[in-house]
Amino acid sequence: MTNRTVDETRRPQTPLRWAIAGAGTISRSIVPDLQLLPGNHVEIIFSRNPANAASFAEEFGLDRWTDDFDLLVRDPGVDVVYLATPFATHAAMARQALLAGKHVVVEKPMALNADDVQDLFALA
């Protein structure tokens, strides 16, 4: 037994609705896996490059894409944001998503320094 408990009000209900940030190689690997998992649905892809986002959405049968990360984190139809963007963007984007009330899965490294990591832990 630990002295920590799970805040059940923050536990997402299924299906988990995923937003993918980054239309590169790692996202091309993770999206098919998410699409195979019961209780998970990939809702939207984000890329800073609209053509890449549109192409990714078409390739993986996603209905929506965006080049606006602010829009993505404000989307009430998204529960989880998966960050597979250049690593220098991870901390800021994770912070933005956490502040918007989203669950976040971030590729390594989570941040470029320990202070940013501690900040993200505190927000989560």
List PLM regions with ranges.
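Conserved donor-nucleotide/metal-binding helix-loop-beta segment in metal-dependent transferases, i.e.
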Residues: 124
